[in-house]
Design a protein with these regions (language model features):
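Bulky hydrophobic segments
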Residues: 1-150, 155, 166-178
Length: 178
């Protein structure tokens, strides 16, 4: 079994989790992350480790969304919130799961970014940084998928990914509040 098939299997297994199990796994990961950040706060090696984890996360996301896909048909849905209109019109409820999974995919990025950004900056400043940074990354992924015919390109994916990153950043700040 090569690395590519192992990654595909892992992604498939994660995607097939029920939403309750996925939320539970995310919650446990956040608790573990918060515990480690609090325990090792102020250590010199913590930020480089978080930066490395963020780079690893970005590599995994690019692998999942761009490099592991083969070319084929592509559709573009650039109308904001079109996913919800399509669900209400009777299309597959799988679209709702896909929206949720897009948010979950970017949640770790916001969590990691919270540990990397300077602590003396306000939450609002950090939130703007996260929205711009991960919004542009997500837009880049969607445009790459569209122009290389690697799947559907949707504005809603950019929205859900960005909301997931913002939720991760908010989770980081909730843990540090007194």
């Amino acid at each position: 079994m090569n690395v590519s098939s192992m990654i595909e299997r892992l992604v498939h297994d994660i995607y097939c989790l029920t939403p309750k199990k996925l939320v539970l796994c995310c919650f446990l990961a956040v608790v573990a992350y918060c515990f480690l950040c609090r325990k090792y706060a102020g250590r010199r090696w913590l930020r480089p480790c978080l930066g490395g984890l963020l780079a690893l996360w970005l590599s995994a996301v690019l692998w999942i969304t761009v490099f592991s896909r083969s070319t084929g048909n592509t559709e573009a849905h650039w109308l904001p919130l079109s996913t919800y209109w399509r669900i209400l019109s009777g299309e597959s409820r799988e679209l709702l799961r896909s929206a949720f999974m897009n948010a979950v995919l970017f949640f770790p990025a916001g969590l990691l970014l919270g540990g990397l950004l300077p602590g003396h900056r306000s939450f609002r400043w950090q939130l703007v940084c996260a929205v711009i940074c991960f919004g542009l990354i997500s837009l880049g992924i969607e445009l790459t998928q569209f122009f290389n015919r690697l799947g559907n390109a949707e504005f809603d994916d950019v929205l859900h990914n960005t909301l997931g990153a913002a939720a991760g950043l908010a989770a980081f700040h909730v843990k540090w509040s007194d």
